[in-house]
C-alpha cells in the first residue's frame, strides 16, 4: 500500500492526548491511501474535508449518510472518506468487506494498518471530521448524528 504522511509539530502532544500521535490543529496532513478498488486516493492541498470512521458502527453511519446524498458529493466537496479496517480479520476484509465496499458508488480510502489509524484523532462511536485548508488542519470535530455529517458535506 502506498502511504506517505507528513504531520508537523508533534512535540509533547503524545503525552497529553489519548490519540497520541494523531493530527491536531495546525498540522500538515498529506497522505496517499488505496481505495476499495486499489486506486490511489490523495489527501492533499486541494482536500477540504476528511471524514474518518474508525469502526463498524461509524462506517455504517457514514454509509447511511452517503447513500442519501448524490454519489458525487465527496468529489464535489473535495472530501475524502477514510475507513479504518485495521482491526478486521484479513479473511473478512478480503471476502466480505472489500467486495461490499466495491459496490458503493463513492470512493472509500482504506486504512489497513493500525499505525495509520493512530494518525487520525478518534473518539468512541464518533465520526472524525477534519477540515483542511491548503493541507493544514484547521478544525477537528467528532460527530455521532447523521444530520451533523450531512451538514459538514453541504
PLM features: residue spans?
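Bacterial N-terminal signal peptides
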Residues: 1-12
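N-proximal helix/coil linker or "cap" segments that precede and/or mark the start of modular domains
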Residues: 10-28
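A short beta-strand-turn-helix
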Residues: 30-47
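Short active-site neighborhood of thiol/selenol oxidoreductases, capturing the structured segment around
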Residues: 42-59
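Thiol/disulfide oxidoreductase modules built on the thioredoxin-like
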Residues: 43-45, 112-149
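Solvent-exposed loop/turn segments at secondary-structure junctions
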Residues: 56-58, 85-89, 114-116, 137-138
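Short, internal strand/loop/helix patches
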Residues: 80-82, 97-122
Amino acid at each position: 500500500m502506498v502511504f506517505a504522511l507528513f504531520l508537523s509539530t508533534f512535540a509533547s502532544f503524545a503525552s497529553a492526548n489519548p490519540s497520541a500521535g494523531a493530527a491536531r490543529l495546525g498540522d500538515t496532513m498529506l497522505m496517499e491511501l488505496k481505495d476499495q478498488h486499489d486506486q490511489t486516493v490523495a489527501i492533499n492541498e486541494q482536500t477540504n474535508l476528511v471524514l474518518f470512521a474508525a469502526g463498524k458502527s461509524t462506517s455504517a453511519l457514514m454509509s447511511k449518510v452517503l447513500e442519501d446524498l448524490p454519489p458525487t458529493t465527496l468529489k464535489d466537496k473535495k472530501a475524502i472518506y477514510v475507513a479504518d479496517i485495521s482491526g478486521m480479520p484479513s479473511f473478512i476484509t478480503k471476502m466480505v468487506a472489500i467486495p461490499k465496499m466495491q459496490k458503493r458508488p463513492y470512493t472509500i480510502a482504506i486504512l489497513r494498518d493500525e499505525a495509520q489509524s493512530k494518525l487520525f484523532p478518534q473518539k468512541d462511536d464518533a465520526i472524525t471530521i477534519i477540515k483542511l485548508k491548503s493541507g493544514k488542519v484547521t478544525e477537528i470535530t467528532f460527530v455521532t448524528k447523521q444530520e451533523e455529517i450531512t451538514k459538514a458535506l453541504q
